[in-house]
């Protein structure tokens, strides 16, 4: 296994896990926010999950771009 393939495998694995967690948090957040439970605290918890998921998706997009840039540079150097 070369350094380039290791970086590419690590990048794709981390990115897949990150997007999966984003989708899970997004779904749970909307389920809690839209639930017919009359407890405001639960609905606010869903709203907080949604806000955190959006921020995480932004940083995940930036981070995956940086990872792929590093992978590209490593493949050009090797």
UniProtKB/Swiss-Prot annotation:
Subcellular location: Cell membrane
Keyword field contains Secreted: no
Transmembrane segments: 12-32, 53-73
Signal peptide feature range: none
Induction trigger: Up-regulated upon UV stress.
InterPro entries per UniProt: CedA1_arc
Keyword tRNA processing among record annotations: no
Predominant location: membrane
Membrane-topology descriptor: Multi-pass membrane protein
Keywords, alphabetical: Cell membrane, Membrane, Transmembrane, Transmembrane helix, Transport
Gene Ontology CC: plasma membrane
Described purpose of this protein according to its UniProt entry: Part of the Ced system, which is involved in DNA import.
Subunit note: Forms a complex composed of CedA, CedA1 and CedA2.
Name of protein: DNA import protein CedA1
